[in-house]
Amino acid sequence: MDQAKLARMQASVRIGGKGTPRRKVKKVHKTSGADDKKLQATLKKMNVQPIQAIEEVNMFKEDGNVIHFAAPKEERALTVGCEIKVHASVPSNTFALYGNGEEKELTELVPGILNQLGPDSLASLRKLAESYQNMQKNQAGEKKDDDEDDIPDLVEGENFEKSVD
């Protein structure tokens, strides 16, 4: 062994009596794989069963956004890790979702999500529609003002060329 390396190792180890520090051991951090195994074991105890043919899962948040889990389309099905899995245990009222969720606004999902909306979400959808209509009115009002500025007003008895100059 290298003498310098041996000297460093001896410096960190103290052989002695009471009150001397022991050899320093590097801590090994747990990986998420161990947590996943514990979670799987707990879900197995709860008798969680897989639910087939789930196309999408939407979780509505209080701020109006939606956490959207979508089943892979046929062209994306070969990609590893983009699949959504749903497991449920009805007696224990437990549902487990596996997959990558995307946070989206309600407007991005509007056509296909209308049948999933509850009373709270319908109220937020109404507010969203009202704000969209107000934005459209404001934009139409601005366009109307722009159009009026481009076209000069003609007064009876005047010629168009005179009003342009």
From Swiss-Prot:
InterPro entries: BTF3, NAC_A/B_dom_sf, Nas_poly-pep-assoc_cplx_dom. One of its GO terms (cellular component) is cytosol. Keywords: Cytoplasm, Nucleus, Protein transport, Repressor, Transcription, Transcription regulation, Transport. GO terms for biological process: protein transport. It is found in: Cytoplasm; Nucleus. Gene3D superfamilies: Nascent polypeptide-associated complex domain. Residues 33-110 form the NAC-A/B domain. Residues 145-158 have a biased composition (Acidic residues). Residues 1-34, 133-165 are annotated as: Disordered. Residues 20-30 have a biased composition (Basic residues). Pfam families: NAC. Its main location: cytoplasm. Component of the nascent polypeptide-associated complex (NAC), a dynamic component of the ribosomal exit tunnel, protecting the emerging polypeptides from interaction with other cytoplasmic proteins to ensure appropriate nascent protein targeting. The NAC complex also promotes mitochondrial protein import by enhancing productive ribosome interactions with the outer mitochondrial membrane and blocks the inappropriate interaction of ribosomes translating non-secretory nascent polypeptides with translocation sites in the membrane of the endoplasmic reticulum. Part of the nascent polypeptide-associated complex (NAC), consisting of egd2 and egd1. NAC associates with ribosomes via egd1. Belongs to the NAC-beta family. This is Nascent polypeptide-associated complex subunit beta. It comes from Emericella nidulans (strain FGSC A4 / ATCC 38163 / CBS 112.46 / NRRL 194 / M139).
